[in-house]
Amino acid sequence: MKDSVIRKLEGLLERNEEVLALLSDPSVIADQERFRALSKEYSQLEDVVKSFTAFQQATEDLEAAKEMLNEDDPELKEMAQEEMKEAKSVLETLEDELQILLLPKDPNDDNNAFIEIRAGAGGDEAAIFAGDLFRMYSKYSESNRWQIEVMNTNEGEHGGFKEVIAKISGEGVYGKLKFESGGHRVQRVPETESQGRVHTSACTVIVLPEIPEAEAIEINKADLKVDTFRASGAGGQHVNKTDSAIRITHIPTGIVVECQDQRSQHKNRAQAMSVLSARIQAVEDEKRRSEEESTRRNLVSSGDRSERIRTYNFPQGRMSDHRINLTLYRLNEVMEGVLDVIIEPLILENQADLLAALAED
């Protein structure tokens, strides 16, 4: 391992000890905000510290085995060779592990997320597929013990959704779901199709990290236009007699957010502001990325939300992710929420891309 990497790891080890000492400091314990921030940092350092400590131990074992080679006893020499072989194998594994742990982390990976699914080309069939996608993500959330809370729906005339927005809360939600942003295409025979012809329709999925209140960008109230209206259900009928639904327009960006799934106007407004904050933050992040972008671009992109990323072919039972040329004939499982078979390869491909970028630098 390079000396520069070793020095960086030693620095993280020292920082871990500092943070541990600070967490037992009464003045830090009294300051809840600082205590939470340090607790989070300590948790983030845990894996790299554990791996580097094991790496240091394996390095010592290797040096001790090398010294044993100088012994005259043939049995000790043989033992030393075995120990050297084992230590080298452990070091190789730990070096790969540490390289991954040192990769730049998306600060939002541990955050909750908002997921927005919109029917695109394909009319009723696109809306039905949007409903299928929402069910798929709901099943995946359940398997991870995440909570899913519907914030806004616009139901399709023959089932599904023209649009559905939900908040998913739990550990590492955004880090797992962020690569789902993009165009999702479906190829299947609609139930209403009498000739058995395969139709193609599409949906767009957007995944945004929830921005913690302390980190949220400040939104000027003068930049907001707030409208209230009656919440409506399927077919457009009004489902209550009070103006509990909220529509907020952010005038500078033109972003519009509607929330009507809560009975309380206050709750709908709070949820709408939360989604608005996430969308504005996403616009700012995209602008910054565009300014910083070099010729190199990540293979697995969570940025271009209009790009077609995946095809679900029902007649063939096939799911293809076009970003990493992954094809699986496990469509029924995927639609039942078995998504790690797609998500894990995407995460690994992203890590490989980041490693390649670091090597170039």
Curated annotation (Swiss-Prot):
Matches recorded under Pfam families: PCRF (PF03462), RF-1 (PF00472)
Localization annotation: Cytoplasm
GO MF entries: translation release factor activity, codon specific
InterPro entries per record: PCRF, Pep_chain_release_fac_I, Pep_chain_release_fac_I_sf, Prokaryotic/Mito_RF, RF-1
Coiled-coil ranges per UniProt: none
Record's comment on post-translational modification: Methylated by PrmC. Methylation increases the termination efficiency of RF1.
Any single GO CC term annotated in Swiss-Prot or TrEMBL for this entry: cytoplasm
Region named Disordered: 283-305
Keyword Protein biosynthesis among record annotations: yes
Assigned keywords, A-Z: Cytoplasm, Methylation, Protein biosynthesis
Annotated Gene3D superfamilies: 3.30.160.20, 3.30.70.1660, 6.10.140.1950
Biased composition (Basic and acidic residues): 283-296
PROSITE patterns named in the record: RF_PROK_I
Residues recorded with modification N5-methylglutamine: 237
Main subcellular location: cytoplasm
Family: Belongs to the prokaryotic/mitochondrial release factor family.
Function summary: Peptide chain release factor 1 directs the termination of translation in response to the peptide chain termination codons UAG and UAA.
HAMAP family xref list: Rel_fac_1 (MF_00093)
Descriptive protein name: Peptide chain release factor 1
Gene name tied to this protein: prfA
